[in-house]
Amino acid sequence: MPGLNLTRNEATERASIIKRVHSYRIELDLPKDKDVFSSKVEICFDAQEGASTFIDAITSSVKSINLNGEELSTDLADGERIQLPNLAAENTLVIDAEMFYTNTGEGLHRFVDPADGEVYLYSQFEVPDSRRVFPVFEQPDLKAEFEFIVRVPSHWVVVSNQPEVKVEEKECGCGRAKTWFFKPTPRMSSYITAIVAGPYEKVTSELTNSEGRVIPLGVYARKSLMPFVDAEDMFELTRQGFEFYEEQFKTPYPFEKYDQLFVPEFNAGAMENAGCVTYLETYVFRSKVAEALRERRAITVLHELAHMWFGDLVTMKWWNDLWLNESFAEFMSTLAAAENTRYAKEAWATFAASEKTWAYRQDQLSSTHPIVAEIRDLADVQVNFDGITYAKGASVLRQMVAWVGQENFMAALKVYFDKHSWGNTVLDDLLVELERTSGRDVRAWSAKWLETAGVNTLAVEIENDEAGNISNLGIRQSYAEGFETLRPHRAVIGFYNLVDGKLTRTDRIELDIDGELTVVEEAIGKKRPDLLLLNDEDLAYAKIRLDERSIETAIKHLGDIDSSVARGVVWGSLWDTVRDAQMPARKYVDLVLNNIGKETNSTALRTQINNLSATLHSFVAPEAREETRHRAADRLWELACVAEPDSDAQLQLLQAFINQTRTEEQYDNVQRLFEGELTLEGLDIDADLRWNLVCRLATGGRFSAEQIAAELENDNTANGQQYAAQAYASIPTAEAKAEYWNKIMVTGELSNMIQRYAISGFKSGKPELIAQYNEPYFEQIEGIWRSRSHEISMQIIGGMYPSEPTAELLERTEAYLASLPEDAAALYRQIAEARDGVARALKVQAADI
């Protein structure tokens, strides 16, 4: 994998030689039953005369290379790059090669549907994987027009960035085939081109955009999955997104059509291929799901649509400005949801519970980096699709918008799009427009917020007189060691008092916080509230420390706060407090168990359940862990039983109970639910919930391999195969663990999604069963990182890292990190992040007294 790297210096040098890439004409022959496919490309480009460079091409074989009419030796190809000597000022390059299909979700992924045996293909090119499908100058600033011609079996359809211009059918050696001819694209980067092929089914619609142009819409999925696709919801969200973005940006949608395709075994949430967006199939709901997942799908739809402007129309010059794509799409998707969809009431509460939690965690790891990151090579960028680039960037943009004003912000974006359409940009291209429209010193703001790392802490310092009125209120700002930056913050202080059993806001102060201490003069003389909530409305990006009185109020009445955003801020503040070892973990467990029953925001409920799970696993003192886990599972069962029938809370609380099951009595309840002897009013044991029960029963030694096989026979679908892999790997025997260790760590035979589920199963259950694999992990992981693809190795490095946080594990990890060679920086980062988690867990355990 490291041998496939491309450095920024190499890209800069190549861009100085390649003056302009005009066009690619790409002919693909895609058989359904082979491991390789034919790829023939003609590239027209201008270059520095007499210079030499290379083109990226990860090939099975290269049949021929022709540069300006001269046949070159195929020895110039090494399977990863093809050398191009003695370039002319104007060049035509023709390469005929064979490329590999993959089962890793990178390049051109091939999937066989177990339900009907049909073959499906889709491409995933970001960051550096269009080179797995056709020879290409794989860097974002060498834009070109792309014309695709694709031959496939006659019953397949092909979807790409542009509409097809014609489809020809004829007999060939392997039966009848169709050749699809697509219009050339506008100038774009190679990573947002796309090919999706197979017997996909589709639903169509259209919209009329702000120019009066009719935009065709399509939603695609596998035949066996199409009955579960909610195309109308996708179309509704898409129309709402189009309306909002075109109005805000004053820039029309830049492409001719907008197709959205659910594709199998997809690694990410979605990919913003221009006019041809791909989504993971988790967003097709064949069973009842938490409302949090429906809202996440909506945010993802809006996120990918925002990319049509941020990233596709205007693209970063190099990957250090990836945030110009991802932070903007992340922020704009929540803004669009809040201002133009049915999720208006909950969108920012969801942002607080999800994105902010992710950002704060990532920003406190040793791998944290500025939003505008230093990206030396592709290995750097592949690990920077993280909580900084996405969630912190979006959080900071929200702060910027509050600071410069939304109208000024959007006006700057219009000029930015007008100036740089179909081109590439750097940070300063945006800052100059923001300064012009707002009159603010945005560069100074950027230096503190975008170009430095770390999260500040804002703490309330409050005093009151004998009458209970505030006599002094200050906000003290601090920073973590090694990140000595104090930043300006726009924030709101909310005054909350108990009114008829609800914590209701009775006053607010909006202010700028800057420097070490900000005195809030406006608060002096006001009645001290039951809860003084710093960062009410969640505008600021900072860890929040409440005063003691407010903490006690929150612990007793968190579920009684009537604002979901305010609850989210309090939940987040208390979670940070326990993570920083300033609240005992068991006290936090009680806080969660006493309040989640009243939480109405689905994502907040999901986040608190996840935080509860992390606390039980890693933060509770070892001597109290089992008892606390048993008590927590019992309480989750009680909450599930009294939750409103058929509600979101009932489903989430029941799933949480299933995952925390430990005692024989708890397993009895799981088994009785599975067998139908026990029911909860309104609860349907549908396909996915049934598999949840199967996996947990397997973990507890109550479900055999033969029983799992029988379940799979009844649900031999992509979902069923994934769950079955998890269940098999969950069986608590040495033989089952050894079998899946071998499949994951040795043979590498599993596809990306099957491997993900298998890792989850392998790690479940009693830690002593897999403790013997701790040392083999360290012995094998560098070899896996060097030999497997990026996505596969990322899953294994993080997923198979020993799970029990102990002092011995911390010591072993430190020794391993010290032994890594310099060229393993990306591997070092991933292991170091795991090490950080162990170190934090040990610190929090010590405070759990």
Regions found by a protein language model. Name each.
Residues M1-S38, P114-Y120, P140, R443-A447:
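N-terminal, polar/Ser/Thr-rich
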Residues A57-P114, P135-E138, C172-G175, E516-K527:
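A surface-exposed beta-strand-loop module
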Residues S61-L67, V442-R443, A453-L534:
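Beta-strand-rich binding/interaction modules
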Residues G387, A467-N472, F483-T485, L498-R505, ...:
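Long, ordered, helix-rich scaffold segments
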Residues E42-T59, E138, E147-P153, G474-R476, ...:
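Surface-exposed beta-strand/loop patches in extracellular or lumenal glycoproteins
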Residues G3, E98-E206, E374, Y541, ...:
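Extended, low-hydrophobicity, Ser/Thr/Pro/Gly-biased non-transmembrane segments
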Residues H22-G50, V460-E466, I475:
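Extracellular ectodomain segments of secreted/surface proteins
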Residues F182, E211-V214, G218-G482, A614-T615, ...:
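Hydrophobic alpha-helical and helix-loop surface patches within well-folded domains
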